[in-house]
Amino acid sequence: MPTMADYAKQPIADRLKRCERTPDEMAAAIQGQSEAVLARRPDAKNWAAKECACHLRDAEEFFGAILKTVPAQDKPAFPFPDADTIAADRQYLKSDAAQAVAEFRRRRQETLRLTRALTPEQWKRGFSVGGNAMTLDALSALMAWHDDNHLAQLKRALEGKA
């Protein structure tokens, strides 16, 4: 699996192509899986497949907010989201995995629409998350890596592996 640094070396267009595939890959992975399999955690620390799907959906909401804000503001700061708190607050284990994938798909389409509208200068615009500075260019590498990471986690969870 490529690292964030590997993705950062790729052209932005290649990173976005990777991101375009994620909704279909996630839908294919959960298709035909029982609720018991989707909700099964491989161990006490790791998420079930449906939790991975919900996390990707909600992370996309965060990425979309960044992509809407950064072109319009000078170096905005965003808090670092606590994924486990969000998972508990939004009751991921009670969510419908297919619905989470459908919502992720909708949000991802909007995110990709926003990225296609960015100018070369806007890709260089900076912001921070939890005090860590980055650019929209770096965000695209993070998104591609994040997709790979959590798709792999989702697939392992379906197999009952951590």
Description of each model-found segment:
Residues A36-R41, D96-A100:
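Short helix-to-loop capping/linker segments positioned immediately adjacent to catalytic or ligand/cofactor-binding
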Residues M1-R21:
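Extreme N-terminal tail/first-helix region
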Residues P2-M4, A39-A83, L112, K124-A162:
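Short, contiguous alpha-helical
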Residues R18-A29, I86-K124:
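Acidic/histidine-rich alpha-helical segments that form the ligand environment
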